[in-house]
């Protein structure tokens, strides 16, 4: 009987995926524990929204720089060191929570430092995917990484974070810190060197940044996808930054059941990751992208209009599945269309816009909740805006195909009609 052995490329993908999965589990625990910790220090919706804004603000400040850096160094090493840095920051936060010396302002500082390390870890990790998966398996690989993100951050991290916070407030932060250590150790199994253009003549960081931005400026499809991605992030974060208040105040859930609510979202996210490649095969990338944005909007609008826990949980699952499908399409388009040596810089520019829109949306969402009187109303507004965004995407992409094209064609701005 023949024994099937995995290829070196398969094993490298497994090591990177394992590290990403554990890192996402740690991140998921923190994404629930930090807002819950914040609600013990303040119940002001603007201050709660400011926590999300603080976590993502580094993408506005350092996203481009992080992208340029990961195009100059070994990407595996950059990801490893960033995970170690995140572990240290959360370890110090654990001590603050345990001793009772934590304040909302210290929470903001920790969130800012974590977000800064995340710009390196995410840029490096995302740029590694084509190197370990290959162009022919990008759709499948991106679906696996999306599934790992949803499984870790929502399906497991959410319930673990809320349950352990209810037991002992410092416990989830301890698990969070340990998880990033494990994620860093797993990267040691990723053999090979991952420095782009190794051996090339040294260049100035500023020149590298300019080269990446010039390439993006001459790629009309990527420009449109960046705009659509940024608007999707902004309109979605209006509501997502208020999720903890929506669950605790509008739905009257407890801290522990908030994790179960997130668990349903995890189920939807996993379904979206599993179905996305099949949907792309059946319909193409563009219908999945546009339809996914529209369904996200309908789900959030429904959550705002029908504030019943079971209905809201189901709709949140629908939202999670749809947003994962959207993310798979966007990630695959980036990897397929951007040259490998420019991937870090283009990703940095992309994340600066898309993830930089998140703190803006979070702050606006906090203001909307204060103005309208409930987080549920903010969900309704967010949903209607996302439905409108789906219509905008139809117009913006009407002359373009999202099927993989050689990077040089995009560099010339090649267009194709449907």
Regions of interest found by a model, annotated:
Residues 1-418:
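Alpha-helical transmembrane-bundle signature of multi-pass membrane transport and export proteins
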């Amino acid at each position: 009987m023949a024994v099937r052995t995995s290829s070196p490329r398969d094993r490298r993908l497994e090591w990177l995926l394992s590290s990403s999965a554990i890192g996402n589990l740690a991140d998921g625990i923190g994404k629930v524990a930090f807002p819950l910790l914040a609600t013990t220090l303040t119940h002001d919706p603007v201050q709660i929204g400011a926590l999300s804004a603080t976590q993502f603000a580094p993408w506005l400040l350092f996203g481009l720089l992080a992208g340029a850096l990961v195009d100059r160094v070994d990407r595996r090493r950059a990801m490893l060191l960033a995970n170690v840095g995140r572990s240290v920051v959360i370890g110090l936060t654990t001590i603050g929570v345990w001793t009772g010396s934590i304040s909302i302002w210290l929470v903001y500082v920790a969130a800012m430092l974590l977000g800064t390390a995340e710009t390196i870890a995410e840029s490096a990790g995302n740029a590694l995917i084509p190197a370990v998966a290959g162009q022919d398996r990008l759709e499948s690989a991106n679906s696996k990484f999306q599934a790992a993100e949803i499984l870790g951050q929502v399906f497991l991290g959410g319930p673990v974070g809320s349950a352990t916070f209810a037991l002992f407030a410092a416990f989830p932060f301890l698990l969070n810190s340990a998880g990033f250590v494990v994620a860093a150790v797993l990267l040691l199994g990723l053999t090979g060197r991952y420095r782009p253009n190794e051996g090339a003549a040294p260049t100035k960081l500023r020149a590298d940044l300019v080269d990446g931005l010039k390439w993006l400026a001459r790629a009309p499809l990527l420009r449109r996808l960046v705009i659509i991605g940024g608007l999707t992030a902004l309109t979605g974060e209006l509501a997502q930054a208020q999720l903890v208040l929506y669950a605790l105040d509008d739905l009257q859930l407890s801290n522990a059941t908030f994790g179960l609510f997130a668990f349903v979202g995890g189920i939807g996210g996993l379904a979206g990751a599993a179905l996305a490649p099949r949907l792309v095969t059946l319909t193409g990338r563009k219908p999945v992208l546009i339809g996914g944005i529209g369904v996200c909007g309908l789900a959030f609008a429904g959550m705002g209009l029908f504030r019943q826990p079971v209905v809201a949980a189901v709709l949140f699952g629908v939202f999670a599945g749809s947003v994962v499908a959207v993310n798979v399409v966007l990630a695959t388009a980036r990897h397929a269309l951007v040259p490998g040596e420019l991937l870090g810089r283009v990703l940095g520019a992309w994340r600066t816009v898309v993830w930089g829109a998140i703190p803006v949306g979070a702050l606006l969402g906090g203001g909307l909740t204060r103005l309208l009187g409930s987080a549920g109303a903010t969900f309704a507004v967010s949903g209607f805006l996302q439905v409108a965004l789906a219509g905008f995407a139809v117009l913006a992409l009407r002359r373009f195909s999202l099927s993989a094209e050689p990077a040089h064609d995009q560099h010339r701005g090649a267009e194709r009609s449907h």
